[in-house]
Design a protein with these regions (language model features):
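Hydrophobic/aromatic residues within well-ordered alpha-helical segments
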Residues: 49, 56, 60, 64, ...
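C-terminal alpha-helix
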Residues: 132, 181-188
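Amphipathic alpha-helical segments used for helix-helix packing
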Residues: 93-114
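Generic hydrophobic, amphipathic alpha-helix propensity
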Residues: 3-14, 31, 56-60, 64, ...
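Conserved amphipathic alpha-helical interaction elements at protein-protein interfaces in regulatory
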Residues: 16, 20, 48, 70, ...
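Hydrophobic/aromatic-rich alpha-helical bundle segments in the mid-to-C-terminal region
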Residues: 79, 100, 113-124, 137-184
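Helix-turn-helix
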Residues: 9, 13-51, 55
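Hydrophobic alpha-helical connector segments
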Residues: 55, 69-97, 148-155
């Protein structure tokens, strides 16, 4: 088993802290305690908290992009959708929500480069969902009520807000409703 470097440990803990508390909900002191280093040494790797969050968004987005790319588009569209939805369902009941969803609620506090990265994350997901819906269209007996790209925005927005509401209400009902909407759309 590979031992993580201090930088990797800082980044991993940051991913968890942001998903639990948001950008303003943790400090370098919190990270220092978790990793067992001095606060000043964190600045060696990430001079500012903005640098740290930018790297966290980059890492989280890269992981999710790889997960999306790994979905085999030769599978039935319902299976593709189920694979895509699995992380959203898994997040329900945990104390962590989507990192980019959490940070999107704090965009007014974040630097412009992070704002752009968050937009890119949303667009990546919406584009993949739109492609899925386009692949499902020929199998449907009726057309979608809105273009696939618009429906993709609705579904992704519903999944993101569903994760936030799941934490608030302690139930996955809203994530399941969004997931059911996508599954019904691709099932025809």
């Amino acid at each position: 088993m590979k031992t993580q470097s201090v930088r990797e440990q800082l980044l991993e803990h940051t991913l968890v802290l942001i998903r639990r508390r948001g950008f303003n909900g943790f400090s370098y002191r919190d990270l220092a305690e978790l990793v067992g280093v001095k606060t000043s040494s964190i600045h060696y790797y990430f001079p500012t908290k903005e640098d740290l969050v930018q790297e966290a968004v980059k890492e989280y987005s890269a992981r999710l992009a790889e997960r999306i790319r790994s979905i085999d588009t030769s599978l039935p569209v319902t299976e593709q959708a189920a694979i895509y939805l699995a992380p959203f369902r898994a997040s329900c009941g945990s104390d962590q929500i989507c990192l980019c969803g959490m940070l999107s609620t704090e965009t007014l506090c974040l630097p412009e480069p992070v704002h752009k990265m968050l937009q890119g994350f949303y667009l990546m997901n919406e584009q993949w969902l739109a492609g899925l819906l386009e692949r499902a269209q020929p199998q449907r007996s009726t057309p979608f009520p809105v273009p696939p790209a618009r429906l993709a925005q609705v579904v992704f927005g519903s999944l993101q807000s569903g994760l936030i509401a799941a934490r608030l209400f302690g139930t996955s009902d809203r994530v399941e409703a969004a997931a059911d909407t996508l599954m019904a759309a691709v099932a025809g």
